[in-house]
Structures are given as structure tokens and as C-alpha cells.
Amino acid sequence: MAQVRGSFEALYDNVDKDMALQAIMRGQLKELPRVYTKYFNVRTSDRKFERVVTYVPFSETATKGEGETYTFDTLRQGYTKDFTHTTAGLGFEVTQEAFEDDAENVITQAGTWLAFAARYLEEGRAANPLNNGFGTETTPDGLSLFNTAHILKGGGTAKNRLSTDADLSASSLAQAMIDTQTDQKDEAGHLAAPITSWKLVIPPALEFTADRIVNSVLLPGTADNDRNPIKSLRTWDVIVNPRLTDTDAWFLIAGNKSQHGLTFYRRIPITVEPMDKDPKTKNRIITTRHRFSIGAWTWIGTFGTQGA
């Protein structure tokens, strides 16, 4: 349906515009900054889908007696994860008259608003692996992204979720740090080096709690004069994501992006096409489209809990 003058009369009534309209259209309300790029691996793609394959490394070496043959092992394929790109787009059509009478240049900025709509969608989609990480968002082992029993291809299990979900506190965060040291394993069950730099991703409701926990020099919320080991033993970056839907859930993501598998593949970037004109009506048409995929090809380097 084309934009006509009657559907937005305030733009064409030849009187001073309401200040609320001015605030929206003239940029006094600012767009939310991008959040997902702070912790996602953002990569470009030139294929219709991307496939990530993990592998099972060698087991431990075996005792070998003098003159005896060596024990041999093989590298094996682990799990496979496909990222299938989806296309999103939006169009805007305006009549010739509405375009001509656009005294405030609102209609001519339609391309900017279309790009904003695309960015807003991407930000929301990028929050889904965390929002759905305890249910429908799965890793290649078929289990939820945050789970207490991830299946290792070489045998055994590992977890990246508290055994009993807990609200964010100094004690629950300390337990998460312990769990990441005992359960960050490769597919053969080998323990990985402890991750010492973390991004703590939280909803706005936990911002002040998180700041007290990770930035207090002394133990927060106690009368003890002990130092705060959460601050002294780890490096933290608190990231507030307003697109998280659970006000109690909190997440840990490795500060070094190469140590986790949260990935955003960009097949076609946000593209606003040049303004077109309908030859029959002379209506102006503007469209935008983008193709991308989002997910986690491994649970390693992440940790999450739903809260109590």
C-alpha cells in the first residue's frame, strides 16, 4: 500500500509540527547502539549456507614397553553445524503527490528508516541464542546451548550451566568460574586452559548488581574485609543487552571471540536500493534487504543460567 498524504496529515497541514514528531524525525531520540557485535563473531559468507565441522583430537598417549609396538589413534569427525541464511526485507511506497509535498523531508529519509528497521531485526535475532539457550537453541550435540550434560563425541559429558540455576550473586558467579575450569573440555574430554577474560551479558535489571559484583575491590554485600577474588582473578566486561527477555538470566561469554562459537554470518549486508519509480503511477518505491544466519556451533566458551 502506498503512503498517501492523508495517512500522515501532520506532514502536510502547513502548521507548526508537534514537538514529539520533531523529536522522532530530527534525531533527538537516538538509536540503540549495536550490542551483539560486542560478543558475536561476525563473519561474511559467500555461500548459500555455512557448515562448521568439529573434530575429536587424539586421546592420551599410552604406556609403551621396550620393543613393543606403538598404540595408534586417529583424528575423528565430531559434530556438524549448518548455518542456513534467511532473507529479510521491507519496502516503502509513496505517491507522487505525497513525495512532492514532503516539506519536512521526512519521506525522503525513508531509506534511513528502512535501514534502522533492518538493524533492529538483526539485534533481536542475535539475542535469540541467549533468550532460547535453555530450550530451542541447540548446539550440534542436539542439546540446548546451556546444558548440564553436553555430550562429548569422544565419550563423557560436560556442562556450561549451573547444576541448580541461581540468581546473579558473588557466590553463583564464583561457582560458574569453578565450573568453567572443570568442564571446559574438547570433544576428547581434555580440559582446556581456563578462560580468564569474560563478558558478562545481562538484562538491564541486573546492571547494578553486576557492577557491584565484578568491580568491588572487597567482597560485595558483606562486612568482611576480604578482597573480591572475582575482580582480582578475572577480567570482566559487563554488557547490558535490552533485548534479553528474562530479567533473571545471565550469561558468560569468553572475552576472546576465538574461544567461543557464537557466530553471525552476513551473506548480504543491509542494502537500501536506489529509489525506483512505478511507470504507471509515478509512485516512489524504496526497498531494503539483507541475508544472514545466527547461531552457536559449540557450547564451549559460554555459560548461562536462567536465575532462580
Residue ranges and their predicted role:
Residues 85-100, 157, 194-199:
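Glycine-rich, often proline-containing surface loops adjacent to acidic residues and nearby aromatics
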Residues 87, 102-109, 113-116, 195, ...:
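Short, well-structured alpha-helical interface segments that form or flank functional binding sites
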Residues 1-28:
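N-terminal alpha-helical "arm" segments
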Residues 2-9, 148-185, 196-199, 205-308:
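Sequence/fold signature of self-assembling virion shell proteins
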Residues 74-84, 175-189:
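Structured alpha-helical segments in the cores of large, soluble enzyme domains
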Residues 26-88:
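Assembly/oligomerization interface modules of large self-assembling protein complexes
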Residues 135, 186-193:
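Surface-exposed acidic, glycine-flexible loop patches that form ligand/cofactor-binding
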Residues 97, 102-109, 116-179:
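Alpha-helical scaffold segments that mediate packing/assembly in large oligomeric complexes
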